[in-house]
Amino acid sequence: MTDQALWAPWRLDYVNTTNQDDGCFLCHYRDADPACDSEHLVIQRGPHTIRLLNRFPYNNGHLLIAPRDHAADLDEVSGEALAECVGELQAWTGRLKETISPDGFNIGLNLGRAAGAGLPGHLHWHIVPR
């Protein structure tokens, strides 16, 4: 599995709707009643971040880590939020290692539509177990 391309045919619904402007789902989930977290796949909230399962995952365990503040670029994110994001990346890769024993991870963010960002206005990290 580790040398396979990152393509998941079940993501086609997402790919076909990426040009629709329905607002920022991360801000919507951030502002929603925490009682709706399971419906929104939110697994944890922090003072500066929100963590959730990807609704259209490449692999099992595909997570998103995002700052609470709507920011398109790293220089728009506070130091506290960046530190919390990096801490959560570390914590969740550790949890995923313990629970699903992946061979590795793809971890990253896409800044801007040209870089492949499906939501270019609100940066977020992907953790994709491989």
Specify the residue positions occupied by each region the protein language model found.
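HIT superfamily nucleotide-processing domains
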Residues: M1-R130
